[in-house]
């Protein structure tokens, strides 16, 4: 494959830094990025899009609902997953930077069998942090682990190493997947997102979704599912219940069967419904789960009139002629701590 040049960007965060330091708007963009560089681009590559600075375009350069954004609301700014929808992101050239935990094979290579990641300086060298901050991106990840799994991340790290590692790998992938699904759903104003970033520059729990040696981390597989050309997923619409989504970004019409299941663990199916679905190329389909079910089942567990009837909602898309689902999405109405796991938290 060949490298293709599509966009030329003048700089990264120059306008943002000037604005955050309190400079007036006339000082955010200097003549080189405002006049000289775009003139050169027009002369030599008039076919390309020129962006003076990333981020830029809003009332403030770092405003995320206009122009080009850097979105770390879900992430460094510790906002809840709902912020991805509230912020109205239109396009983000950087987003969802987390300290993604590598696989055990790399941990063993780094520290010897059985040694746990923690506060040791040699481990922290591989954990990203912003200059001048009192926290790093491992603190960010542990914040969400505590919030989503209702456990004390610090205590868990020392008391149950295996569970801590499993949840740290899972939580960053889940946050990325949920955010991207929010942006891909029908009605979203978002037209694209670039993850920060692909590959770690050194061994450790870096921003990369693959480690420094090219081995995918858990987050990579969550992204693979949520960014697939053909995707099926569920979103929580509050008192309106769960919504079912199917996205077809391929050049071909999708034909097949969509199946929604509500599952009560460990082994009961409380509801199951299937329907034929045909979806044109480059299109989206959305329907409320309540419209597919025969009666009200509080799919998002928003009304809470009694005990939760299902811990997992599963949506599967199976293409015509295939024996296995081509896409799947899941929701956890009662939270991510499932009955079989609750003893360990």
Language-model features, listed with the residues they occupy:
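Active-site neighborhood of glycoside hydrolase catalytic domains
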Residues: 2-63, 171-174, 213-214, 218
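Acidic/polar loop patches that form or flank catalytic/metal-binding clefts of enzymes
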Residues: 6-7, 43-54, 61, 191-192, ...
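Substrate-binding clefts and catalytic carboxylate motifs of secreted carbohydrate-active enzymes
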Residues: 39-42, 78-246, 250-252
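Exposed beta-strand and adjacent loop surfaces of beta-rich binding modules
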Residues: 241, 253-259, 312
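Hydrophobic beta-strand positions in extracellular immunoglobulin-like domains
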Residues: 246-248, 262, 317-319
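A short beta-turn/strand-edge loop motif at beta-sheet boundaries
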Residues: 249-256, 268
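Terminal connector regions
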Residues: 256, 292-344
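Intrinsically disordered, low-complexity Pro/Gly/Ser/Thr-rich segments with frequent PxxP/GP/PP motifs
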Residues: 259-306
